[in-house]
Amino acid sequence: NPEACIQCNQCAFVCSHATIRPFMLSEDEVKAAPSNIKLADTKPKASEYKYTMSVSPLDCMGCGECITVCPVGAIEMVPQESQAEEQPVFDYLVANVGKKPGMPADNTVKGSQFNQPLLEFSGSCAGCAETSYARLITQLFGEHMYISNATGCSSIWGGPAATSPYTVNKDSKKGPAWANSLFEDNAEHGLGMEIGQKVLREQAIASAEKCATSDKASAELKAAFDKFVETKNDTKANTPAAAALVAELEKAAAAGC
């Protein structure tokens, strides 16, 4: 019910399977959306965007957690088959609508739920709190995550043969790196993953430094390398710096550096 909804996003926050998600749409995105989409002005005050909370009826497990947590009773459970026309709306939003400038901060319940979940539609039980926590972590850190999974429920829904509920960000194409050790040593296993990642990164930096400090290196490459090193321990700042360095290294490689 878009009139009753206060847009707190708590329903998406508790969803075990990432099947209910909020979106903010621009004017062009609204025009391109299916005609049956339910929209509302943003709250607590209107903005240039329209708000919608969309559900994937084919993936919803019917646990009712969203109804339980909703503070204003804006969600109603109805038979799945009656909501078939909502699936194209959800699919359109997932494929075409992303975060916008000026959205609530990622470190808030409301703001975090506008981030793409990188854990979705898993085989965990309906209402499983474990996947709710794991999904939230991927929304905050998923593009930079290394997961050393302990053997248990999370290894069953997290890594079933031939499928994976973990995915990649649709823009960056990056997502969690997942592995599971059967020997009840995931702490040691995870430490090994971290050490290995650090060694590989140090080797990559050393190789980039050779190119960036050579006589053939351009001023742009040197600046990009310096920025990368300066921000290497700041994930948010280092992400664009890494992309810029890779672009300059590719140019240098093409020029024979």
Residue ranges and their predicted role:
Residues N1-Q7, M24-G62, Q80-E85, G111-S122, ...:
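Ferredoxin-like iron-sulfur electron-transfer modules
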Residues Q10-E29, S56, E65-Q83, S132:
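Iron-sulfur cluster-binding cysteine motifs and their immediate structural context
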Residues S16-D28, A32, Q87-G102:
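Short secondary-structure boundary segments
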Residues C11-V14, K43-A46, I67-V69, L136-F141, ...:
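A general structural signal for short secondary-structure junctions and capping/turn motifs
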Residues Y92-C257:
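Cofactor-binding active-site loop characterized by glycine-rich and histidine/acidic residues
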Residues Q10, L25-E27, K31-N36, E65, ...:
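Short acidic, glycine/serine/threonine-rich loops at helix termini
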Residues T52, I75, H144-S148:
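Structural motif
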